[in-house]
């Protein structure tokens, strides 16, 4: 009897490509999701046993191996669609009760479970190993820690995707007709039967309905524009069709460490001590070896790891306490992990971390030096960085072509110089077709013409792998180029690297040659093996004249390289100002093009802090100013995170961006600036109207964040950020509240925020106020003093003072936020009733948007949702919130109900003790509680003799 009804494959499961995949882009690329719609059976000619048919979200439908021929083409991403649920198990991150789909249980922590979405979104400690439960009844499968593993972006029919009717559509013209598109607004379960199995879609005509995406194995939709559904770790997903018990045995047999592996323990002492119990035990001397590199000596029978640190010292460790250090050598191709927080944690003492390293995350590089302590110097693009080996993963050799194209360009140029040296060293006495390339290199036009007359069919002959046209184009021998073209040289002939003559002209900075080649039909948009156009080559070399020539000849400036970067992406990175100006003026440039990291050109400019690019892009595409990446980050978020203050000013003042825009974690730019301790940016954002009381996903305000990170930002305020830090510190010191207390960055920012109106009693989702996060009583009092100062200033200020002292709330056109406090007391339209009236001023948000009558019942500002603490009229008197007739009626009704309740209570309460209820009734009709009645002979109310006691139940 099968104890687990979900243990086998079922239609409806959601899958991604697996380890044995060999079917190219049938799934539309790695990371795309499909649905199992048919299970193979014995005797079927098209879908035999141990195969399944998958309907991919983007339309393809094909069968795949799930054990057939011993191969497994697919991985199971989600089985919530077939009803898998873990009753009474709560995800300790998102708090959802009854985890749907696979369950992930931490091996290090007591009773800690995650759902698939939280597990794949890097919740909890990445250095902890987990167990995977495919169903509520299956045996657990141990998986390695997520640390250092590559995450793959999940793509398909998810929230935000554009869809049309799909293969199982049976809903008539609900979509508005064949070919009409809709947008997915939500992925949900079908009642209590299944999870994440249907999609709510809003069609172009405005109607919204729910459609199957795996429910009962049906797929009603086809994705035309994919959306991101999160991430997944390929190594941690089960192979579809492989029995869980075999996968469990595989995970047990495949120990994460082998003899000779280089390892480190990177855990805190307290965590390590706790983990060591039952795994070799704890010895205080082990603390000395935390962070040191050791070598795996052997694996014990229990699976623990014996590590040798020097010739004499060996310790036994819990396997989950160790991190394997990849062994790399000069020339190895590596990938930098894409988790910024993990990299920041590993880099101290190993090259350190700088915000300029952020673009390397997830990118591929080459090891150019190995240091004695194991750290690596890695070339990524046109820069090199020192990395902790724990921040790198090995990269497959067959994918080396995806190395940053700028490195390829440099290598190509150096190779060309070598080729030229070889050509020029060859003898030219003999008269043969092979000499054509040599005479072209020597710029001997007469000899080239003579050879072409003798050997007209040899015009494309190669020497050292290059044609005469390619060499002449590189060197700028214009006359030779024209002669070769007149002799019908193949203008788009490629060399071994895929470069054409136009690529060679770009490499050689030959603008005139490029114009001649284009006039003769050279393909300006042809890609070489590194996925680079001639324009990209010219930009990467900084050759302004060639870039200008190619742009004038209408080449496509939007073509990306293998990393999705366009020529303008690279120009921004290299800060080639003239090239940036040229490219941004091209009429058909698309500023919305995203690279593989999801950065459009405005995002990328903000990330790099390129002021010129920001100004140029905003001048032509200001509508992008609040555009978001997949993670919800806007250009202002990126500028705030990376401390690009001048860029932030441009975005706010010239771009008129929304300073309170939130990312997917509900963080505003102000939150990010505080997280990084960027004092100057904090002051800028607050002065430009950032909401100091805005919540993030945890309910934390800016002040919560500043005080939560005060220990991490231990640098004294006056030593931080030069003049900006000193300026803020001086302002705070001038208040007289600080005394001799030394402020670090976090507490100084908190004081500043309190002075600017931040609510010091605001409770987050854990019920903690900012003051609850402070252990130093002196700091608590200082922050209270600054907060009190703000309140006193607001109360004492008159109408004109209020108007003058308001922070400028930055707004965007065509929204109701253009309403502002007028310095002249003239009637203004109320946002609620539309009557002309003198508007009421709200505190602390400073908005004036409604009249006195409409303001009386408001508890929160309808514009910013901040709780109103005070409402002032134009004459600075406070609005009296007198009760309306409706509230008076409600109060009267409440009083009447209270009177009735008291009367009912009196009827059933014992008249003697007035505590207990009447449970015994006498023949006269009165009564008492049982305890009081025992001593009674006459009724205490009517004085009649008690002859009978009747028990009642109230």
Curated annotation (Swiss-Prot):
- SMART domains, A to Z: ANK (SM00248), RING (SM00184), ZnF_ZZ (SM00291)
Under Gene Ontology molecular function, one entry of this record is:
ubiquitin protein ligase activity
Specify the superkingdom: Eukaryota
Q: Which UniProt keywords apply?
A: ANK repeat, Cytoplasm, Metal-binding, Notch signaling pathway, Repeat, Transferase, Ubl conjugation pathway, Zinc, Zinc-finger
Q: Where are the zinc fingers (RING-type)?
A: 830-865, 910-943
Q: Does the keyword Repeat apply?
A: yes
Q: Among the record's GO biological process terms, what is one? A: Notch signaling pathway
* Location in or out of the cell: Cytoplasm
Identify the pathway.
Protein modification; protein ubiquitination
This enzyme catalyses: S-ubiquitinyl-[E2 ubiquitin-conjugating enzyme]-L-cysteine + [acceptor protein]-L-lysine = [E2 ubiquitin-conjugating enzyme]-L-cysteine + N(6)-ubiquitinyl-[acceptor protein]-L-lysine
Q: Which residues bind Zn(2+) 2?
A: 106, 109, 124, 128
Q: What does this protein do?
A: E3 ubiquitin-protein ligase that mediates ubiquitination of Delta receptors, which act as ligands of Notch proteins. Positively regulates the Delta-mediated Notch signaling by ubiquitinating the intracellular domain of Delta, leading to endocytosis of Delta receptors.
Q: What is this protein called?
A: E3 ubiquitin-protein ligase MIB2
Species this protein is from = Gallus gallus (Chicken)
Lineage of producing organism: Eukaryota, Metazoa, Chordata, Craniata, Vertebrata
Originating gene: MIB2
């Amino acid at each position: 009897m099968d104890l687990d009804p979900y243990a086998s494959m079922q239609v409806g499961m959601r899958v991604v490509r697996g380890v044995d995949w060999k079917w190219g882009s049938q799934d539309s690329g790695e990371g795309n999701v499909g649905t199992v719609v048919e299970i193979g059976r014995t005797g079927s000619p098209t879908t035999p046993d141990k195969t399944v048919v998958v309907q991919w979200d983007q339309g393809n439908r094909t069968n795949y191996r799930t054990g057939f021929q011993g191969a497994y083409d697919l991985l199971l991403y989600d089985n919530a669609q077939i009803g898998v649920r873990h009753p009474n198990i709560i995800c300790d991150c998102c708090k959802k009760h009854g985890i749907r789909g696979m369950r992930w249980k931490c091996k290090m922590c007591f009773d800690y479970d995650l759902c698939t979405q939280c597990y794949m979104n890097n919740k909890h400690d990445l250095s902890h190993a987990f167990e995977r439960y495919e169903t509520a009844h299956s045996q657990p499968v141990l998986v390695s820690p997520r640390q250092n593993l590559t995450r793959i972006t999940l793509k398909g029919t998810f929230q935000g995707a554009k869809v049309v009717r799909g293969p199982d559509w049976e809903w008539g013209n609900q979509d508005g007709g064949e070919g009409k598109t809709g947008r997915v607004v939500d992925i949900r379960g079908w009642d209590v039967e299944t999870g994440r199995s249907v999609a709510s879609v809003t069609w172009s005509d405005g109607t919204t309905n729910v459609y199957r995406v795996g429910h009962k194995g049906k797929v009603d939709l086809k994705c035309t524009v994919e959306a991101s559904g999160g991430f997944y770790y390929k190594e941690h997903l089960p192979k579809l069709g492989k029995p869980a018990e075999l996968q469990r045995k595989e995970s047990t047999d495949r120990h994460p460490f082998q003899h000779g592996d280089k390892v480190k323990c990177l855990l805190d002492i307290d965590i390590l001590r706790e983990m060591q119990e039952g795994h070799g035990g704890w010895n205080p001397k082990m603390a000395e070896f935390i962070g040191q590199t050791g070598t795996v000596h052997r694996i014990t029978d229990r699976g623990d790891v014996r590590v040798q640190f020097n010739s004499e010292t060996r310790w036994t460790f819990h396997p989950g306490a160790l991190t394997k250090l990849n062994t790399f050598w000069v020339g190895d191709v590596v990938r930098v992990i894409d988790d910024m927080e993990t990299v920041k944690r590993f880099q101290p003492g190993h090259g350190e971390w700088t915000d300029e390293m952020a673009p390397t995350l997830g990118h591929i590089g080459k090891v150019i030096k190995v240091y004695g302590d194991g750290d690596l110097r890695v070339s990524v693009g046109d820069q090199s960085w020192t990395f902790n080996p724990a921040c790198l993963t090995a990269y497959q050799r067959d994918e080396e072509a995806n190395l940053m194209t700028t490195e390829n360009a440099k290598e190509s140029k150096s190779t060309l110089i070598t080729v030229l040296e070889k050509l020029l060293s060859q003898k030219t006495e003999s008269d043969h077709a092979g000499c054509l390339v040599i005479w072209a290199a020597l710029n001997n036009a007469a000899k080239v013409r003579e050879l072409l007359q003798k050997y007209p069919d040899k015009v494309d002959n190669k020497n050292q792998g290059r044609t005469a046209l390619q060499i002449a184009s590189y060197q700028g021998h214009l006359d030779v180029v024209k002669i070769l073209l007149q002799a019908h040289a193949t203008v788009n002939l490629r060399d071994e690297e895929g470069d054409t003559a136009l690529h060679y002209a770009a490499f050689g900075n030959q603008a005139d040659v490029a114009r001649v080649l284009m006039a003769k039909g050279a393909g300006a948009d042809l890609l070489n093996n590194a996925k680079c156009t001639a324009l990209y080559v010219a930009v990467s070399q900084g050759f302004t004249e060639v870039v200008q020539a190619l742009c004038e000849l209408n080449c496509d400036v939007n073509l990306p390289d293998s990393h999705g970067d366009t020529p303008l992406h690279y120009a921004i990175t290299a800060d080639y100002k003239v090239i940036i100006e040229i490219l941004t003026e091209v009429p058909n440039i698309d500023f919305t093009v995203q690279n593989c990291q999801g950065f459009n050109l405005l995002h990328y400019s903000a990330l790099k802090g390129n002021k010129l690019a920001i100004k140029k892009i905003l001048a032509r595409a200001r509508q992008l100013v609040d555009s978001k990446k997949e993670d919800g980050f806007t250009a202002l978020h990126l500028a705030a995170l990376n401390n690009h203050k001048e860029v932030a000013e441009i975005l706010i003042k010239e771009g008129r961006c929304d300073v309170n825009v939130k990312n997917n974690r509900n963080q505003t730019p102000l939150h990010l600036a505080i997280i990084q301790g960027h004092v100057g940016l904090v002051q800028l954002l607050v002065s430009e109207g950032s909401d100091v009381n805005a919540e993030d996903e945890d309910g934390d305000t800016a002040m919560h964040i500043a005080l939560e990170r005060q220990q991490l930002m231990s640098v004294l305020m006056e030593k931080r950020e030069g003049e900006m830090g000193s300026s803020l510190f001086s302002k705070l010191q001038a208040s007289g509240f600080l005394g001799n207390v030394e402020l670090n960055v976090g507490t100084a920012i908190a004081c500043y925020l309190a002075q600017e109106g931040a609510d010091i009693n605001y409770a987050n989702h854990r019920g903690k106020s900012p003051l609850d996060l402070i252990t130093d009583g002196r700091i608590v009092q200082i922050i209270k003093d600054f907060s009190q100062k703000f309140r006193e200033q607001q109360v004492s200020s008159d109408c004109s003072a209020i108007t003058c002292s308001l922070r400028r709330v930055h707004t965007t056109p065509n929204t109701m936020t253009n309403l502002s406090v007028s310095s002249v007391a003239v009637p203004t339209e109320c946002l609620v009733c539309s009557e002309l009236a003198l508007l009421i001023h709200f505190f602390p948000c400073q908005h004036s948007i409604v009249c006195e009558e409409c303001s009386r019942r408001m508890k929160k500002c309808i514009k910013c949702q901040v709780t109103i603490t005070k409402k002032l009229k134009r004459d600075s008197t406070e609005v009296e919130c007198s009760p309306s007739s409706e509230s008076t009626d409600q109060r009267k009704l409440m009083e009447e109900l209270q009177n009735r309740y008291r009367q009912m209570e009196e009827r059933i309460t014992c008249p003697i003790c007035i505590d207990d209820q009447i449970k015994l009734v006498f023949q006269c009709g009165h009564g008492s509680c049982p305890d009081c009645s025992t001593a009674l002979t006459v009724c205490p109310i009517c004085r009649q003799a008690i002859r009978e006691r009747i028990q009642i139940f109230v």
